[in-house]
Amino acid sequence: MKFDEIRRSFYGTWHATYQALDDLTAQEARGMPAIWRELVTSGDEAGEAVASLWRQLCPRLPRVADFLEENLIQVGLSRMTTPHHVVRGFQLGDRAGYDTTEIALVYITRDLDHVVPFNAWIGRQPFRQELPAWWDSVRSVLGDLATEFHDGFMLDSWEQGLLAIPDMPTMSELWIDYVDPDAEMMYVHREADYQAAVPREQWPDFSQLRVIAEGTTNRAWAVDQRRADNTGWGDGADTLAPISDLAHSIEDMLCELMIPRT
């Protein structure tokens, strides 16, 4: 796919622009991971290499690797000037100044619904700061993708996908407007009962649930940051459910975005 064709059609919620390697400043070029440069310059042959990296670094999401191997058109770069959680930062106050300008990795993939010329998935720079205390909980689900390849994996046009480490809130922060702290009952998915009432004493501790992935309509998936065993909680604020294999549930969400239902 031609660069100019992608640039004309490229859009995003992060005020992002599609960039060529030659468009980068000297500082941006120096800060870019070497593997990114290799993938960008490999053109339409990047799919196999990308899939191999995913299988190595994020082994619990094999269907994502399979999709990328078959449907990655090419890898590119984007200069993004607003993080995808700027609205949440405004709500919480202490994150309101989190705006950044950075070069991000862009996956240009086929739109299997044939609605748009392509879909764009964005991964931010690998996380190089001191890892948070709850990192092992996230790592048990998503492996080393965020620290070794790129941080986060978000569909460009929506807040959907794997969150970057700095953007992982607790569930109580994420649903600050949705969860009533004084309620005595919470309605969740429980087996075949769509909205089973769970008494307060059986609620999870929302302040200990760290959100690592998001979908549409306030759907979220979270690890219990006191555990590192690929378990967690997920779905919506009024349909929350315990999950025994969190990676599989997150992969289902990503595949819903990537692969049309037949």
Regions found by a protein language model. Name each.
Residues Q202-P204, A213-T262:
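A recognition module on extended beta-rich or small alphabeta surfaces enriched in W/G with H and D/E
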Residues M1-R219:
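A surface-exposed partner-binding patch
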